[in-house]
Amino acid sequence: MTRLPILLLLISLVYATPFPQTSKKIGDDATLSCNRNNTNDYVVMSAWYKEPNSIILLAAKSDVLYFDNYTKDKISYDSPYDDLVTTITIKSLTARDAGTYVCAFFMTSTTNDTDKVDYEEYSTELIVNTDSESTIDIILSGSTHSPETSSKKPDYIDNSNCSSVFEIATPEPITDNVEDHTDTVTYTSDSINTVSASSGESTTDETPEPITDKEDHTVTDTVSYTTVSTSSGIVTTKSTTDDADLYDTYNDNDTVPPTTVGGSTTSISNYKTKDFVEIFGITALIILSAVAIFCITYYIYNKRSRKYKTENKV
């Protein structure tokens, strides 16, 4: 008996046709419905489940049984018994509600062949539209604002009192690659501090340098070079103040940037399609057996009643 529902399920999967799609936004309610083609047979039970292996509910007459932590507060069953259309309403959609929903009808013939159970299955895809980026993404990427930058040219430097000659090396462009995020740092001028050991005079030129980031945000980096002329030689030191530290959270390899999940769902249920079909078949068999027992009991009772009436007349 269990092979028949499995065979019917395989046949329905082979001849499956592309199913319709329903698109909703997060927080909305989605109503899914499907019609059965066989309008002559009697519906024993209807069911809804979500692919790949999450059963939602089973409905027999006026009784509705929910599975896999689904409740009527989340998904309401809005179909009268033995209707041509079965309908459910999913309330307050979230990204996890997206996926393929399947409705199934289990029907029996209205003739005397009560052992035959027909099975119909229809699919509907629910798409839940999510926002393109979250608030955290906007703050870290700086895509919603473009800070103003200012550039100050160095004043004239008078090194006439210096007793020695020194050279200042211009730093090469620095490229910081973190996964797909690239920051290109370009220096146009440096802040130079020159100290003469013989004269004791010093001149200072400070210029904030713009750092161009490919993600529409700009920060400044100030580099200072100090050159001291002594009798033993020339000593050059470097100090850096990097405003890009404000974006350490974004560039940190240990930090995972926030992501928005849309259109994908994962089910952790242990149910399989084969189990659903077996449950449907067993339940249908139990219901049919109960109907048969009722009919036999009614027939025997009716027969005795007629016999009793006949004896009384005589």
UniProtKB/Swiss-Prot annotation:
Q: Give the Gene3D superfamilies listed for this entry.
A: Immunoglobulins (2.60.40.10)
Signal peptide as annotated in the record: 1-16
Family matches, as SMART domains? IG (SM00409)
Transmembrane feature ranges: 279-302
The keyword Transmembrane is assigned to this record? yes
The stated induction of this gene product is: Expressed in the early phase of the viral replicative cycle.
Q: So which stretches are on the Intravirion side? A: 303-314
Q: Which residues form a coiled coil?
A: none
Keyword Transmembrane on entry = yes
Cite the residue spans of the region called Disordered.
193-214
Disulphide-bonded residues: C34-C103
Q: In which compartments does the protein localize?
A: Virion membrane; Host membrane
Give start-end positions of Polar residues composition bias: 193-202
Question: What keywords is this UniProt entry annotated with?
Answer: Disulfide bond, Early protein, Glycoprotein, Hemagglutinin, Host membrane, Immunoglobulin domain, Late protein, Membrane, Signal, Transmembrane, Transmembrane helix, Viral envelope protein, Virion
- Give the CC-aspect GO terms: host cell membrane; membrane; viral envelope; virion membrane
PTM entry text = Glycosylated; contains phosphate and sulfate-substituted glycans. O-glycosylation is required for hemagglutination and hemadsorption activities of infected cell membranes.
Return the InterPro entries for the record.
Ig-like_dom (IPR007110), Ig-like_dom_sf (IPR036179), Ig-like_fold (IPR013783), Ig_sub (IPR003599), Ig_V-set (IPR013106)
Instruction: List residues of the Ig-like V-type domain.
Output: 17-121
Q: Which residues lie on this side of the membrane: Virion surface?
A: 17-278
Q: How does it sit in the membrane?
A: Single-pass type I membrane protein
The glycosylation sites are: N37, N69, N112, N161, N253
Q: How does it assemble?
A: Heterodimerizes with OPG040. The heterodimer OPG185-OPG040 interacts with components of the entry fusion complex OPG143 and OPG094. Heterodimer with C3/VPC protein; disulfide-linked.
Q: Any idea what job this protein has?
A: Prevents cell to cell fusion by interacting with and directing the viral OPG040 protein on the host plasma membrane. The OPG185-OPG040 complex associates with components of the entry fusion complex (EFC) presumably to avoid superinfection and syncytium formation. Via its interaction with C3/VCP protein, protects the infected cell and probably also the extracellular enveloped virus from complement attack.
Q: Which family does it belong to?
A: Belongs to the orthopoxvirus OPG185 family.
Stated name of the protein: Protein OPG185
What is the native source organism of this protein?
A: Vaccinia virus (strain Western Reserve) (VACV)
